[in-house]
Curated annotation (Swiss-Prot):
One of its GO terms (biological process) is photosynthesis, light reaction. This is NAD(P)H-quinone oxidoreductase subunit 2. Its main location: membrane. The chain crosses the membrane at residues 30-50, 57-77, 94-114, 128-148, 182-202, 223-243, 255-275, 291-311, 317-337, 345-365, 389-409, 424-444, 477-497. HAMAP family: NDH1_NuoN_1. Coiled coil: none annotated. It comes from Synechococcus sp. (strain CC9311). Keywords: Membrane, NAD, NADP, Plastoquinone, Quinone, Thylakoid, Translocase, Transmembrane, Transmembrane helix, Transport. NDH-1 can be composed of about 15 different subunits; different subcomplexes with different compositions have been identified which probably have different functions. It catalyses: a plastoquinone + NADH + (n+1) H(+)(in) = a plastoquinol + NAD(+) + n H(+)(out); a plastoquinone + NADPH + (n+1) H(+)(in) = a plastoquinol + NADP(+) + n H(+)(out). One of its GO terms (cellular component) is plasma membrane-derived thylakoid membrane.
Length: 523
């Protein structure tokens, strides 16, 4: 992307001195993040007025902030590409798409959070403010193009995630989850800093573009060591095997709405980071990191889906499922082709709705029964057809059953992998998809097939449904929206893939990598 740096310099050369700072910053680029920041500050101020005021005003403030962020992101889609903050942030199409996924995942997570927070006695204002802080870090991470901005945004996301994981202070499992997450996350941050220091020493710059150019001209063993450290950090963030050990315990112990955000928003930011660092910095080590990611993808798909078979907790099952889903997304990353990158973007967008829809059903069941055990879902169809239908459709979509949206997301990934001769990845993906269908359908069978007399004791004591209870209408909106998109979105798979392809086309970083890869293949 040499044209980006020259764009900034040439623009500055013709500007008046008083305008140089504004031209160098291009602060309007981070307008969506500013909207989230204003909403976060407003929730903290409202929280000072007491819990009653918070319960009334915090939700609309969050909706306004996140809604404004999504609108501003849409307006940026066809805007001229300008590096901002002295080249530390770039709002290309890749950044816009992944920032939208992060913001939308937060919005849906908040919709399914209010009733859960009220029932558990969680202060609404503090919870929303910390979740918005995590969102801010995730969105900035998606567009960060400098080691300093990468680290600051990564730690903003991470520290807020630690706080969210341990937010249920009276729950020993939540505290344990937060401690494990903190220890492993701190180690990952230290590893990243060491890798970043090596990159700075090799290039004399913190700019990812400059670092990438320096590594092309003089690849060294130290650069390979830096690649290992950076790859370990990325693998931790996306919960890829063998850096996944924290995931099941954190998912099981954390508040369920927090898990919903971590499974989508945090993972999306992690994949955006992977693209920025691996494709942007380590183009000269393309063969090496793709080989490593091939191994990680195979391990993640295999272990995630096989271990999920033995789980008795719904959240632990979805934790291992998310590890397997990360393996599927890595197929697109390893391909490095236009179709591969587009399929990767598309699958993250589809994963947003089908996974959050599943978590909305789990939260609703937990609110009414206090249970997370899979066996307690037996016979649920007799008592709550809405949860049964919603959870069934979302699980079928996660398994890749046609005509659900998840089927088209996976099929595009497999097509891209096959076209790029990644036959082993595609075969492993197909086999592990079949395995995942087995445990997803096992849950559906338990809910639907069981006779009334075979229903679990929890379902037999299922309370009457009252949707007018405070906090339940937003949850119902999120549930219905996710289920509808998951079930009907398959009809729109071609327009969605065209949108994902335009995301790749509007990202100079990916276009340069595709051109380089094509040139090497022809050579």
């Amino acid at each position: 992307m040499p044209e980006l740096g020259s764009l900034l310099l040439s623009t500055q050369a013709v500007a008046a001195p008083g305008e140089l700072l504004n031209l160098a910053l291009h602060a309007g680029t981070v307008g969506p993040e500013a909207a989230v920041l204003v909403a976060m500050i407003a929730t903290l101020l409202v929280d000072l007025a007491g819990e009653k005021v918070s319960v009334r005003w915090v939700p609309p403030i969050c909706y306004a902030g996140l809604g404004s962020a999504l609108v501003l992101l849409a307006l940026q889609w066809n805007a001229p590409l300008e590096p901002s903050f002295l080249g530390a942030f770039l709002s290309d199409h890749l950044a816009i798409a992944f920032r939208a996924v992060v913001a939308l995942s937060t919005l849906l997570s908040l919709l399914i959070s209010w009733r859960y927070a009220e029932q558990s006695g969680t202060p609404v204002g503090e919870y929303a403010a910390i979740l918005l802080a995590a969102t801010l870090g995730g969105m900035l991470l998606c567009g960060a193009t400098d080691l300093v901005s990468v680290f600051v945004s990564l730690e903003t996301l991470s520290v807020a995630s630690y706080l969210l994981s341990g937010y249920m202070k009276r729950d020993a499992r939540s505290s344990e989850a937060a401690l494990k997450y903190l220890l492993v996350g701190s180690a990952a941050a230290a590893v990243f800093l060491y890798g970043a220091s090596l990159l700075y020493g090799l290039s004399g710059s913190t700019s990812l573009e400059v670092i990438g150019n320096a590594l092309v001209t003089s690849p060294t063993p130290l650069a390979a060591l830096a690649l290992v450290f950076v790859l370990a950090t990325v693998a931790f963030k996306i919960a890829a095997v063998p850096f996944h050990q924290w995931t099941p315990d954190v998912y099981e112990g954390s508040p369920t709405p927090v898990v919903a955000f971590l499974s989508v928003g945090s993972k999306a930011a992690g994949f955006a980071l992977a693209l920025r660092l691996l494709v942007g910095c380590f183009g000269s080590f393309d063969t090496q990191w793709k080989l490593l990611f091939t191994v990680l993808a195979i391990l993640s798909m295999t272990l995630g889906n096989v271990v999920a078979l033995a789980q008795t907790s719904m959240k632990r099952m979805l934790a291992y499922s998310s590890i397997g889903q990360a393996g599927f997304v890595m197929i697109g990353l390893v391909c490095g082709t236009e179709d591969g990158f587009a399929a990767m973007v598309l699958y993250m967008a589809t994963y947003l709705f089908m996974n959050l829809g599943a978590f909305a059903c789990i939260i609703l069941f937990s609110i009414r029964t206090g249970s997370d055990r899979i066996s307690d879902y037996a016979g649920l169809y007799q008592k709550d057809p809405l949860i049964t239908l919603g959870l069934s459709l979302c699980l079928l979509s996660l398994g890749g059953i046609p005509p659900m949206l998840g089927f088209f997301g996976k099929i595009y990934l497999f097509f891209a992998g096959w076209a790029d001769h990644q036959y082993v990845l595609v075969v492993v993906g197909l086999v592990t998809s079949v395995i995942s269908i087995y445990y997803y359908i096992g849950v559906i069978k338990m809910m639907v097939v069981k006779e009334p007399q075979e229903a679990s004791e929890v379902v037999k004591a299922y309370p009457p449904i009252n949707w007018s209870t405070m906090g339940l209408p937003p949850l119902r909106v999120a549930l219905v929206l996710c289920v509808l998109v998951t079930a009907v979105g398959g009809i729109l798979s071609n327009p969605l893939f065209e949108w994902a392809s335009s995301t790749v086309a509007g990202t100079p970083l990916l276009q340069q990598a595709i051109a380089t890869s094509s040139g090497a293949s022809l050579g």
